[in-house]
């Protein structure tokens, strides 16, 4: 792609969205369209193989993602080196995605706004990506305990440890988000003042 503006043109169903989705997946390790990797694989195919070469940090880098149709876990590579998780992709290929549905974030629930915040922070701060992944893992484990402890009361024994660790990791996640919003608010305030001719003042607050 040209370092300036690139305009992708094509007929319907020629793959324009697929191209953008592939770039976003190599950037973040997830799709902006679906949460299921299975839906990213062509119907009838056993796998999907995404790859790109780019200049990042002043040197040439290669990214690759291989998705499988069965239960086999995906494989992510940077420079041919297999990554343990999508957190390793952080900062290599940074992207900013804007879709028509993004206009609904002001009227939709807070989950949509958190998703946009998480997508940006995971690309910019590897530590945030790791903390968020750990928090989600702890949350899922705790949910399973609370669901199954009636049949196995012993499952409740490690619950205090889960709660303590979730509080620790959750504090890290909150700190990252609050700092990012403060920095973003400074820049957004300047742009909004220019757009409104100085008649309005924009502020972003994380609660």
Where are these regions (language model features)?
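An accessory alpha-helical subdomain
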Residues: 101-198, 202, 207
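A structural signal for short, well-ordered beta-strand segments
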Residues: 1, 52, 95-97, 142, ...
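Short hydrophobic/aromatic segments of transmembrane alpha-helices and their interfaces
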Residues: 22-23, 94-97, 163-164
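Generic alpha-helix structural propensity
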Residues: 3, 14, 18, 35, ...
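Short, conserved catalytic or interaction motifs in soluble domains
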Residues: 10, 28, 197
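Pre-Walker A-like glycine/lysine-rich segment at the N-terminus of P-loop NTPase domains
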Residues: 1-25
């Amino acid at each position: 792609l040209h370092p300036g503006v690139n305009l992708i043109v094509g007929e319907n169903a020629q793959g324009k969205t697929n191209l953008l989705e592939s770039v976003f997946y190599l950037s973040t390790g997830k799709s902006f369209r679906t949460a299921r990797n299975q839906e990213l694989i062509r119907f009838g195919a056993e796998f999907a193989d995404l790859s790109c070469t780019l200049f990042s940090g002043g040197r040439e880098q290669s990214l690759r993602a291989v998705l499988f149709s069965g239960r086999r876990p995906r494989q992510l590579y940077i420079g041919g080196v297999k990554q343990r998780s999508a957190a390793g992709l952080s900062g290599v290929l940074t992207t900013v995605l804007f879709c028509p549905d993004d206009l609904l974030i002001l009227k939709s629930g807070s989950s949509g706004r958190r998703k946009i915040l998480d997508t940006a922070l995971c690309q910019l701060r590897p530590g945030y990506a790791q903390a968020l992944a750990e928090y989600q893992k702890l949350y899922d484990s705790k949910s399973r305990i609370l669901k199954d402890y009636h049949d196995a009361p012993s499952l409740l024994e490690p619950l205090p440890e889960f709660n303590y660790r979730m509080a620790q990791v959750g504090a890290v996640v909150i700190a990252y988000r609050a700092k990012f919003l403060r920095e973003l608010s400074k820049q957004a305030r300047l742009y909004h003042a220019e757009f409104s001719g100085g008649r309005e003042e924009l502020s972003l607050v994380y609660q």
